[in-house]
Amino acid sequence: MAHEEKRPWEFSLSLPWELIEEILSRVPPESLLRFKTVSKQWNALFRDKTFINNHKMTFRFILATKSKIYSVSIDPKIVVRELTLDIPGLESHEIPKKLVDCDKLLLCDMEKGVVLWNPWLRHSTWIDQGSNHTRMESYGIGYNNKGSYKIFAFCDRKENHTQRLLTIHDSASDAWKDREPIDNSQGKQIVHNIYTKISGVSLNGNLYLVTYFETTDLVYHLIEINSSSESVVKFCDLPCGTSNFLKDAFVLRVFEGDRFSLLKQCHATKKIEIWVSKYKINNNLDRDVEWIKFMEVSSPNLPDLVDGFDSQPSYFIEDKRLVVCSCNETGRAWIYVFGENKLISKTQIDSVVDLWPSHWTFIPSLVPVPRAQREEPAELQV
């Protein structure tokens, strides 16, 4: 009988599971996708946040200078690597004007369109800007109950640049659709009250934006753009706000995959506060979101997390640590680690030559970039 050659994963049946995990943690992420169907155990492993975080090629921040893009790994030491967008037909030197990190993918604003990108998998797709759009600015990604991805952006009306439109790209139809940015719960235009210094946050398929009421004391809250109905409604109040738009740090993020976190640093006192929503966020309107203070750091000589160009810091929370990326007063990028009411460590990123790089948080994932596919017309039933 001829010898039947075994497939690579068949040899793994006799290996200890810990050794299999160690081997897979060294496999390039784009190759892991092919192994998801090997077994339920392997598929569950690739969904495990601990496995992703411990992978040898995991990184948590993206930095962009005028000419290059970099990834920044944190544990066990800081490692900086150059990245490329790899978009066919795109000029290799073109760097995104803006990146939006949301739902384990990155959205890159380019000169004539947007790029949906998973830099960990080295997957990307190009989406043309709408023909009627000028000065388009992306705010986030969502997906509806049919699994279709949607990109949310604001743009100027071509016939009147003083008016802004909410425009939505649907991956199912590969088309942009414009709508008035009206808060359906209050009948008000929301575009002028969006806190534009930070982008949107994607959670459970919907997009959440920080807005405010212009009263004697600014009142901050979240609005929800529902990806299925495309309605815009007030979702909940935030636990705090800021009266110093330019200098205070004020950044919303997703916490533990199913809640919100909010970082605030007062420019005057340098005190840092982290608030998180106490319970999981569901897809129903929940005006009674309860916020709790997760961390407070008020020790002397804390760094100013808002740089000289008034750019907001990037951050994530892990194992009760707050990890922040921001630039100092000279324009050099630094990584700060906070915990137990103190600054634990700070490291300057010397590999990035250019001053004042832009920076974003990134959540590594094996989520493939959705491809635009036009829906075929349904067949007539006779």
Swiss-Prot record:
It comes from the Eukaryota. Coiled coil: none annotated. Keywords: Kelch repeat, Repeat. One of its GO terms (cellular component) is vacuole. Gene3D superfamilies: 1.20.1280.50. SUPFAM superfamilies: F-box domain. Pfam families: F-box, FBA_1. Kelch repeats lie at residues 150-196, 334-381. The keyword Repeat applies. Residues 9-55 form the F-box domain. PANTHER family: BNACNNG10540D PROTEIN, F-BOX PROTEIN CPR30-LIKE. This is F-box/kelch-repeat protein At3g16580.
